Amino acid sequence: NDELKEFYALFDKTFLGLFPSFIDEMNALLDAEACTEGRRDGELTTVLRIYALIRLGIADTATIAALLHCSIRTVYNYRSFVQRHVRPEVGDLEQRVQLIGINGNSDHSTQNPAI
């Protein structure tokens, strides 16, 4: 399973290199209960990897599950949990995730003070 760990590490490093504010901007869309931090040394959690793939335009649950080597149910459960914790003013979460990292589209007025 070292290859999978290496894949995750490379994905996380590359993605955060492209979108360094991703974790903060993602957390700004959620209430305090759902806010998450990356793991040590810049590793993303499974939830953050799911939404990183959505940010990259991959929204199909089965495709996300295949890429992350987890079950469709796991992806569905994480997405459902996050959807329940979207701040009311955010609106369509996945549409907002698509805007993360695009200059001028980050709405810092919705940032969660718990971040």
PLM region spans:
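Short, charged/polar, low-complexity loop and linker segments
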Residues: 1-2
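Cytosolic nucleotide-binding catalytic cores of signal-transduction proteins
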Residues: 5, 9-115
